[in-house]
Regions:
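Positively charged n-region of N-terminal signal peptides that target proteins for export
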Residues: 1-4
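Hydrophobic h-region of N-terminal signal peptides that target proteins for export
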Residues: 10-18
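Primarily membrane-embedded glycan-assembly and transfer machineries that use lipid-linked glycans
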Residues: 6-9, 259
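Cell-envelope and extracellular/periplasmic
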Residues: 20-490
Length: 490
C-alpha cells in the first residue's frame, strides 16, 4: 500500500512539474498593441520539443503551429491587418494547456529608449516635475487606444531571449508611470492617425550609449573594455553592451514602426568626439536586429543644461559637442530626424538636467513621425538648421535648411549668435533677418569683429536662443567657419 501511494505521489509530482510550461513572453500579453499591416512575432516557452498552436481572433487563416526547441523556446509569425480599436485575442495552446492574451489592439508601435530624460515618467520625480502633467494624468483615460510597457531594467553579457514587462492601458492610475516623452508622443500620434498606439519603453537613467551597443560593434572601439560588462567595480550605467543584451535584444523581436532615442547626457565626458559615429552604428545595428533597415530613427537633442557647474567637474562646451554630434548623426542615418530642444529649458532649470517641458518633445517627435513614416512629407516638422555662411561687406550671411517660410517675428533683439575673428574670441553679434526671393537669411555683425571667420549659435552648455522658424521650432545650435562653411555644405 505504501509503495502504491509513493508511486502515485511521484506520478502527481511529475505531472505537476510538466504542467504550466506553456507561456507567452513577458512582452506578449493582455492589453498589448500589435503593429498593423505586417507580420508580427509571437513567442514564448513550452515543454521542450512540444508543438504549439497560435490562433488570432482577427485572422481568417488557419492557426499557426510551431515546435519548441530543446530549451522550450518557440515563436510564430502572425499576419495583422489594418488598425482597429476593437479588442482582439491571441491564444496559444499545447497539449492540454492554453494561454490567452486579451484586450489586444492593432495599430502603431514605437520603441522608446535612452537614459533618464526618456525614462522620466509622466508623474515626474522628486524635484523634477513634468509641466502640465496633472491635467494629462487626470484626463488620460480618454486615450483608449494608447498602451505602454516598461521593460524592466536588466543586465546581461550575452543576448537574452526575453525581458520582463507588462502592458498597461492608459488611465489616471497607470499613466503616471508612463514615459512622459513616450506618453505625449503616443497620445498625439493616436489622435493624428486615429489608431491605437503602443509604446515600448526600454530606458535606463544615466546610461552611456555603449551600454546599448552590441559586442560586435564595441570590440573595435579602442576605448571600450568589454571586460567591464561583468566587473563589479563598474557602475551598471557605464557597462558596455549589458542593456543591449538584456533589454533591447528581447524588445527587438517585437514589430515596431519606429524608434525614439533620447540619450547623450552621460556621454558628455565619455567618447563625446565619436558619439555621432557610435550612434550611427548603433542605429544600423538596431535596425538590423529589428529586421527593417529603413525604420524611422528619431533623435532628441539634449536640452540646455549647465554641465560645467561643478557636478561633473567639466569645462563649458561639452554639452554643445554632443549636440553637434547628434546633428551629424541625424544626417548620417538614413530616414532619421533630430528634434531640436534649445527653447525647452527655463532659466531656473539651468542646473536641472531633467527639464520639465516634455510635452513639446513628444509633440515634435510626433510631427517628425508623421512626416517620415506616415505619408505627410510636406508637414513642416523639422527645425531650421545651418546650411551655409558667407562673408559680405564685413557681415556674415547665414543660410538655413528647413526655413523656407522664414522666421517668426520678434519684438526683442535676436540673441544667441556670436562671431569671431582669427583669434577665436567670440563676441555677441547683432542679428537681422533678411528676406528675399532667394530665401531667408540672418545677417550678423559687430564692430568688435571687423573680419569674422567663425560663427556659432547657442553653442554653450546653457544658452537659450529666441529665433524660431515660421513653424515655431527653434534653430539647431551650430558652429561653422565662415570661409569654409559654404564649400562644406556643397
Amino acid at each position: 500500500m505504501r509503495k502504491a501511494l509513493a508511486a502515485a505521489a511521484l506520478l502527481l509530482l511529475s505531472l505537476s512539474l510538466q504542467a504550466g510550461n506553456l507561456a507567452f513572453s513577458s512582452m506578449i500579453g493582455d492589453n498589448m498593441v500589435l503593429q498593423q499591416n505586417t507580420k508580427v512575432r509571437i513567442w514564448g516557452t513550452a515543454s521542450p520539443r512540444a508543438s504549439v498552436t497560435v490562433n488570432a481572433s482577427w485572422s481568417k487563416k488557419p492557426p499557426v503551429t510551431a515546435k519548441a526547441d530543446a530549451e522550450g523556446h518557440w515563436e510564430v509569425m502572425l499576419e495583422t491587418y489594418g488598425a482597429s480599436f476593437t479588442p482582439q485575442t491571441v491564444v496559444a495552446s499545447s497539449g492540454g494547456e492554453k494561454v490567452t492574451a486579451s484586450n489586444v489592439l492593432i495599430g502603431e508601435v514605437w520603441l522608446c529608449s535612452g537614459q533618464s530624460n526618456m525614462e522620466m515618467t509622466l508623474g515626474g520625480g522628486m524635484g523634477t516635475p513634468v509641466e502640465g502633467s496633472l491635467d494629462e494624468i487626470a484626463l488620460s483615460a480618454q486615450y483608449k487606444g494608447v498602451r505602454h510597457v516598461t521593460i524592466k531594467k536588466a543586465r546581461a553579457t550575452e543576448p537574452q531571449y526575453d525581458a520582463e514587462g507588462e502592458w498597461q492601458v492608459c488611465n489616471p492610475a497607470t499613466s503616471p508611470r508612463f514615459s512622459a516623452v513616450g506618453y505625449f508622443f503616443a497620445t498625439r500620434l493616436s489622435k493624428a492617425l486615429d489608431v491605437p498606439v503602443g509604446i515600448i519603453n526600454a530606458s535606463w537613467g544615466g546610461s552611456v550609449i555603449e551600454a546599448w551597443m552590441g559586442e560586435e560593434l564595441l570590440k573595435d572601439c579602442p576605448d571600450v573594455d568589454l571586460a567591464n560588462a561583468s566587473s563589479k567595480e563598474v557602475n551598471d550605467m557605464y557597462k558596455p553592451m549589458i542593456m543591449y543584451n538584456a533589454m533591447f535584444r528581447p524588445a527587438s523581436k517585437y514589430a515596431v514602426a519606429g524608434i525614439l532615442w533620447f540619450q547623450g547626457e552621460s556621454n558628455i565626458s565619455i567618447s563625446n568626439e565619436v558619439y555621432a559615429e557610435r550612434l550611427t552604428a548603433m542605429a544600423a545595428e538596431w535596425r538590423r536586429d529589428i529586421g527593417r533597415g529603413d525604420i524611422p530613427f528619431l533623435i532628441v537633442e539634449l536640452q540646455p543644461y549647465d554641465y560645467y557647474d561643478g557636478q561633473y567637474g567639466l569645462q563649458d562646451e561639452h554639452g554643445p559637442l554632443v549636440r553637434e554630434q547628434q546633428f551629424i548623426a541625424s544626417k548620417s542615418i538614413p530616414n532619421a530626424g533630430l528634434v531640436g530642444t534649445n527653447d525647452l529649458a527655463y532659466e531656473h532649470e539651468r542646473t536641472q538636467i531633467h527639464a520639465s517641458q516634455k510635452r513639446q518633445i513628444g509633440e515634435r517627435l510626433c510631427y517628425q513621425a508623421l512626416s517620415l513614416a506616415y505619408g505627410y512629407p510636406n508637414l513642416p516638422a523639422f527645425n531650421p538648421c545651418f546650411k551655409s555662411a558667407k562673408l559680405e561687406d564685413g557681415k556674415v550671411i547665414v543660410s538655413f535648411d528647413n526655413a523656407r517660410s522664414g522666421f517668426m517675428g520678434l519684438s526683442e533683439e535676436i540673441r544667441g549668435f556670436e562671431i569671431a575673428g582669427g583669434g577665436g574670441h567670440f563676441q555677441p553679434a547683432h542679428a537681422e533677418v533678411r528676406m528675399s526671393f532667394m530665401g531667408t537669411t540672418v545677417v550678423l555683425s559687430t564692430p568688435a569683429v571687423p573680419e569674422p571667420v567663425e560663427v556659432r549659435y547657442c553653442f554653450k552648455d546653457f544658452e537659450v536662443g529666441n529665433l524660431k522658424g515660421a513653424n515655431g521650432l527653434p534653430i539647431i545650435p551650430f558652429r561653422a567657419k565662415v570661409a569654409e562653411a559654404e564649400e562644406e555644405s556643397n
